Curated annotation (Swiss-Prot):
Protein name as annotated: A-type ATP synthase subunit D
GO cellular component: plasma membrane
Similarity annotation: Belongs to the V-ATPase D subunit family.
Organism of this sequence: Pyrococcus horikoshii (strain ATCC 700860 / DSM 12428 / JCM 9974 / NBRC 100139 / OT-3)
Subunit comment: Has multiple subunits with at least A(3), B(3), C, D, E, F, H, I and proteolipid K(x).
One Gene Ontology MF term: proton-transporting ATP synthase activity, rotational mechanism
This protein's record includes keyword NAD: no
Keywords assigned by UniProt, alphabetized: ATP synthesis, Cell membrane, Hydrogen ion transport, Ion transport, Membrane, Transport
Family matches, as Gene3D superfamilies: 1.10.287.3240
Subcellular localization, as worded in the UniProt entry: Cell membrane
Gene from which the chain derives: atpD
Record keyword Methyltransferase present: no
Function: Component of the A-type ATP synthase that produces ATP from ADP in the presence of a proton gradient across the membrane.
Pfam families for the chain: ATP-synt_D
Biological-process GO terms, alphabetical: proton motive force-driven plasma membrane ATP synthesis
Length: 214
C-alpha cells in the first residue's frame, strides 16, 4: 500500500478528505496557471533583456570610440580634469511594480542626456569631441540602468517560478496522491467492515432461526 495519511478510517474523515482533495486540485490548477503565466512573462522580459544588452554593447563601443577621439583631441590629463569637474547627474528613484504577485523593480530615470552647459564644465576648456563622448556615456548610463531593472526582474521572476514549480510538484506528486491513496484505504476499510457486519448479522440471524425451530 502506498503512503497514506495518519487519520481515523471513518466515514466522517472520508468526507473531509474528499473535500480536501477537491480544494487541493483547485489549488493545483490555479498554481499551474500562475506558473505558466510567469514563464510567459519571464521570456517576454528575457527577450527585452537580450535586446537591451545588445544595444548596450553597441552604445559602449560608440562611447569608448568617442572617448578615444576626445583623448587625442585634448589629451588624457586634460580629459581627466574635465571629467572631475562634471556635475553629478540627477538621482534615480527606485519603486516596485507587481507582476503576477511578484514585486519587481521599477526605476524612474530622469532625463540623463544633458546639454553641454548643464554638465558643469566650461565651454572654453572642451571641444565637440569631449561633448560627444559625454553624450555617448550618458546614453550608456540610461541603457545600463534599464538593463539592471530588467535583469533584476528576471531574477525575481525566476525565483518565483521555481517556488511555484515546487508547490505544483508537491501537490501533483505527493500531497494529492497521498490523499487519494488514503481515500482508497478508508473506502476499502469501510467496505471490509460492512462485509464483516453483514456476515456477523447473517450468523446471528441463522442462530436465532435455529433456536426458534427447536
Amino acid at each position: 500500500m502506498p503512503e497514506i495519511l495518519k487519520i481515523k478510517p471513518t466515514r466522517m474523515e472520508l468526507l473531509k478528505l474528499k473535500r480536501r482533495v477537491k480544494l487541493a486540485e483547485r489549488g493545483h490548477k490555479l498554481l499551474k496557471e500562475k506558473q505558466d503565466a510567469l514563464i510567459m512573462e519571464f521570456f517576454t522580459i528575457y527577450d527585452e533583456a537580450l535586446s537591451l544588452r545588445r544595444e548596450l554593447i553597441r552604445k559602449m563601443e560608440e562611447a569608448f570610440n568617442s572617448l578615444r577621439r576626445a583623448q587625442v583631441d585634448v589629451g588624457a590629463l586634460r580629459l581627466k580634469e574635465i571629467a572631475i569637474g562634471v556635475k553629478p547627474n540627477k538621482e534615480i528613484e527606485i519603486k516596485t511594480r507587481n507582476i503576477m504577485g511578484v514585486r519587481v523593480p521599477l526605476i524612474e530615470v530622469p532625463e540623463l542626456k544633458r546639454k553641454a552647459s548643464e554638465r558643469g564644465y566650461a565651454f572654453v576648456s572642451t571641444t565637440s569631441t569631449v561633448d560627444m563622448a559625454a553624450e555617448k556615456f550618458e546614453e550608456v548610463l540610461e541603457l545600463a540602468i534599464r538593463l539592471a531593472e530588467v535583469e533584476e526582474s528576471l531574477k525575481r521572476l525566476g525565483k518565483e517560478i521555481e517556488k511555484t514549480k515546487r508547490r505544483v510538484n508537491a501537490l501533483e506528486y505527493i500531497i494529492i496522491p497521498r490523499m487519494e491513496n488514503t481515500i482508497k484505504f478508508i473506502e476499502q476499510h469501510l467496505d471490509e467492515m460492512e462485509r464483516e457486519n453483514f456476515f456477523r448479522l447473517k450468523r446471528v440471524k441463522a442462530i436465532l432461526e435455529a433456536r426458534q425451530s427447536m
